[in-house]
């Protein structure tokens, strides 16, 4: 700093006053020339060298003389210094090396120290002002403007630093996974293993419950019926749910905080992993209405109230259940049938059931090829494929104690419990006040676990 001022050669001197008193000391002086404020809209800040030159004088000579006056003014080194600081303040990145007194070279504090150093350098020199008061005014006001500009730049830097600090703090608070990797590597691994083990144990318990339930159903029926296929599909659904739980645990490692566990639970709920109680209620309704597994709007509202789910979630669950549970049961009945036509997605006879697109599912007669008598199937008169109203199948001996009407197995051809009519049965034994179609449509449920 001292060397820079020593290199300047045109110092006329300084009497020890500070820069703040420069303007006050100069205002008492009488102006010897007319003011330039009348010729420029910017007042006295206009440059003295921009005064129009008389026609008789050369413009180049006058311009050179004015430049020499500005460059030789005692305050010009200070003006150049503050201008350089403003340039440094707009540079990126800022220089925080602290090479100048005051640390940061572009700070306002460093400029105050530069003024003190400048006053010491020119204290023994000539007076601070020149013989041109307009030029003195120009230099003082230019230094003041640059000083204000430097202060504004310092405020901008402070705001930027504050914003960066708050932004980084916010990122660290919103993204704790990076901190987990650095600081909680061991604890996160142990928490992840515990959470994965709990999901595996839940899956084992669920599979054990399914096997026990399957053995109980086989004991009651004596033969593996469609219920085994339904339970197998349930096992697949539960396993897939447990798999989603394990995948979710791997995707989001635990941080050991309650907030993360709550976030995982909410994510599981959004992914469609419903509580076991809710799925059991909906499965029970599905097996009770296998002849038409399409709940009405009122039934959906009731199921949603019983399960604590929304109507949309109940609707989506039944759409998936008809594809994963009911359809495998239909396929199994087709494989075990004796003469039933294969399943066709176009709606042909398939032995027991048919899925008419995604609209409804009814029971269509497979033809009743093995039934003697005067009955002839007339599918054109029954849109849902039920036998005519005058036809009633023979009731098996053990079905008298059933609470839900005839078993579904009696309508499956080739099933061990399918109905067998005597060859000499009289027509009046086949007449009933209510047909199976009326019984089903009037709300009687079918229980496939009754055997």
From Swiss-Prot:
SUPFAM superfamilies: Homeodomain-like. Its main location: nucleus. Residues 218-230 have a biased composition (Low complexity). The keyword Nucleus applies. Residues 102-185 form the MEIS N-terminal domain. Residues 33-64, 206-272 are annotated as: Disordered. It is found in: Nucleus. GO terms for molecular function: DNA binding; DNA-binding transcription activator activity, RNA polymerase II-specific. One of its GO terms (cellular component) is cytoplasm. A caudalizing protein which is required to pattern the anterior/posterior (A/P) axis during central nervous system (CNS) formation. Inhibits anterior neural expression and acts as a transcriptional activator to induce posterior neural gene expression. Maintains a proper A/P balance required for hindbrain formation by activating the FGF/MAPK pathway, which modulates the planar cell polarity (PCP) pathway. Interacts with retinoid signaling during hindbrain patterning. This is Homeobox protein meis3-B. It comes from Xenopus laevis (African clawed frog).
């Amino acid at each position: 700093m001292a060397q820079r001022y020593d290199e300047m050669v045109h110092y006329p001197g300084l009497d020890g006053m500070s820069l703040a008193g420069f303007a006050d000391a100069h205002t008492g002086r009488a102006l010897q020339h007319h003011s330039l404020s009348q010729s420029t809209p910017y007042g006295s800040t206009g440059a003295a060298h921009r005064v129009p030159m008389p026609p008789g004088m050369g413009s180049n000579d006058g311009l050179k003389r004015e430049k020499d006056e500005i460059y030789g003014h005692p305050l010009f080194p200070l003006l150049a210094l503050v201008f350089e600081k403003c340039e440094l303040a707009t540079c990126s990145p800022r220089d925080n090396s602290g090479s100048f007194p005051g640390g940061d070279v572009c700070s306002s504090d460093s400029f105050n120290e530069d003024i003190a150093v400048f006053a010491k350098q020119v204290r023994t020199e000539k007076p601070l002002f020149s013989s041109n008061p307009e030029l003195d005014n120009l230099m003082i006001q230019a230094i003041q403007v640059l000083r204000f500009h430097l202060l504004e730049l310092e405020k901008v830097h402070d705001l930027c630093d504050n914003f960066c600090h708050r932004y980084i703090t916010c990122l660290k608070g919103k993204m704790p996974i990076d901190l987990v990797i650095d600081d909680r590597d061991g604890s996160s691994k142990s928490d992840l293993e515990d959470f994965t083990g709990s999901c595996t144990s839940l899956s084992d318990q669920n599979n054990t419950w399914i096997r026990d339930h399957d053995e109980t159903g086989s004991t009651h029926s004596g033969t593996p019926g469609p219920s085994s296929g339904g339970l197998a599909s349930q096992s697949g659904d539960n396993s897939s749910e447990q798999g989603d739980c394990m995948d979710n645990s791997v995707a989001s490692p635990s941080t050991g905080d309650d907030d993360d566990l709550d976030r995982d639970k909410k994510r599981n709920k959004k992914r469609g992993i419903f509580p076991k109680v809710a799925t059991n209620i909906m499965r029970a309704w599905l097996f009770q209405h296998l002849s038409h597994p399409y709940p009405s709007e009122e039934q959906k509202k009731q199921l949603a109230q019983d399960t604590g789910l929304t109507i949309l979630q109940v609707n989506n669950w039944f759409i998936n259940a008809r594809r994963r549970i009911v359809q495998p049961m239909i396929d199994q009945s087709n494989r075990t049938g004796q003469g039933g036509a294969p399943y066709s997605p176009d709606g042909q006879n398939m032995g027991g059931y048919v899925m008419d697109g995604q609209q409804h599912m009814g029971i269509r007669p497979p033809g009743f090829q093995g039934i003697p008598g005067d009955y002839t199937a007339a599918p054109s008169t029954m849109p849902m494929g039920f036998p005519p109203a005058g036809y009633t199948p023979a009731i098996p001996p053990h079905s008298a104690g059933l609470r839900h009407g005839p078993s579904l197995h009696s309508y499956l051809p080739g099933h061990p419990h399918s109905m067998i009519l005597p060859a000499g049965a009289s027509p009046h034994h086949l007449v009933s006040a209510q047909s199976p179609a009326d019984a089903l449509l009037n709300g009687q449920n079918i229980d496939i676990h009754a055997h």
